[in-house]
Structure formats: structure tokens, C-alpha cells
Amino acid sequence: MGQKIHPIGFRLGITADHKSCWYADSKRYPETLQEDRQIRQYITKNLSNAGISDIRIERKADQVDLAIHTARPGVVVGRGGSGIEQLRLGLQQDLGGNRQIRINVIEVQRVDADAMLIAEYITQQLERRVSFRRVVRQAIQRAQRAEVKGIKIQVSGRLNGAEIARTEWVREGRVPLHTLRADIDYAYRTAQTIYGILGVKVWVFKGEIIPGQEEIPMPVPSQTPRRQRRRQQFEDRSGEE
């Protein structure tokens, strides 16, 4: 069922690509897979404040090509490229061996329409003990300003310190999880609070991808009156809770 399966794994080979692109024989496959996991953990840990959205890995012989999608490329690059060089040396030392590592930094253009960055923002606010209803409302408002087709946010755990854990979700627009041609961006993060762990899931529907046609990037909205009208309607509806 489209509602149960991982949205990205459900669309692999159809509208979504693998995050790791390489081939290895059966003897080296476990070792190479573990290296990919090690690379992602190292980058996520050392660039926790850079707004990392995605990490793509390609391998060619002894060369590893990394594509880091980030909302703050200046933090990753550093002054005069020192950040990338330090990251490359750290990865080589962590992995061992003499393999060559190339790093390409790609800036995320629509930050408020990226599921991973939205989930990261929500977890940061929840760890600061902000009300989950307020955080979810703000995240949806920002996504609507980015002109996404639909968004769904689910938060699970001891919400606001309640004794009994529960799950609450909010959806705005369309989120067709069972449609294979739907471009669904999905992310899952956990927030470490004083009451326990809260799970945050975000689904973002960016439109439909028609086979044989190039995906047309959605323009940044420039109509101020239309954006204000949407925000007022959402605030009025959420204020009735």
C-alpha cells in the first residue's frame, strides 16, 4: 500500500533515483555499503548546522564522488574552500586507505519545500520546547509560500509532555502516496526532548512527473497579494482549534 511503504523506495527506478550509484561484487558489497553509511554519518555529524538535505555517492574504481545538497553552502565550503578540504581529509582518515574523494556542494534553492529541511526545522523547535501545534503550523505556512502542491506532517510521542504518547498529523493540499508518477519528498527525524523521543515525518508533494517529459522547476512565487490571501486563510482555520 502506498500509505505504508517508504515513499522514495516505492518509486525507485520510476521517478526516484538511488542515493548511492556504484557496483561491487558479492565479496566487497557489504564493506562498500558500510562505507557509504559511514560517510553519511560523518558528514551529518560534522555539518549538523549546515542544513544538509541529501548526500549522493558515486564510486569509480578508487574514486568516491560526493554530492552534498545543503541549504547553507557557505558553511560547507568555508573560507577559501578550507571547509571542503578539511572535510575531505577527515573522510580519508575515517575511512582509511588512499582512495581519492571529490566533493561537490549543491545549494538547495527551495528550502521551505524540502522535506528533510522541514523535518530538521521542526525537530530543532521541539527540542527547544516549543508547542508542536505552533511549529507544525509555521512549517506548513512556509511550505505553502513555496507553492508546494501538498504537505503532510506527522508528530508522534509524548506531545507537550503528555503522560500518554499519541500521534497527530496535519495535511494541507494533495499528497497522493499511491500515485507512482507523483513527486513525493519524504523525511523522518527524531527530536530528543526531556520527555522522551518525538518522531517527525514529513511528506511533500511537488507535482507529477510524466514519463518522457522533463521536470519543469516551479518558479519562486512573486505575487504578493496571492501569498497574503493564502496565509490569512490558513491562520484563520488553525486559530479555531
Curated annotation (Swiss-Prot):
Keywords: Ribonucleoprotein, Ribosomal protein, RNA-binding, rRNA-binding
SS bond list: none
Comp. bias intervals (Basic and acidic residues): 232-241
Cited CDD domains: KH-II_30S_S3
Gene: rpsC
HAMAP family according to UniProt: Ribosomal_uS3_B (MF_01309_B)
Quaternary structure and interacting proteins, as annotated: Part of the 30S ribosomal subunit. Forms a tight complex with proteins S10 and S14.
Organism of origin: Rippkaea orientalis (strain PCC 8801 / RF-1) (Cyanothece sp. (strain PCC 8801))
Name of the protein in question: Small ribosomal subunit protein uS3
GO biological process: translation
Lyase listed as a keyword: no
Family indicated by similarity: Belongs to the universal ribosomal protein uS3 family.
Functional note: Binds the lower part of the 30S subunit head. Binds mRNA in the 70S ribosome, positioning it for translation.
Taxonomic superkingdom: Bacteria
One GO cellular component, as annotated: cytosolic small ribosomal subunit
GO terms, molecular function: mRNA binding; rRNA binding; structural constituent of ribosome
Alphabetical list of Pfam families matching this protein: KH_2 (PF07650), Ribosomal_S3_C (PF00189)
The KH type-2 domain, residue ranges: 39-109
Residue span of region Disordered: 214-241
UniProt xrefs under SMART domains: KH
Coiled-coil blocks: none
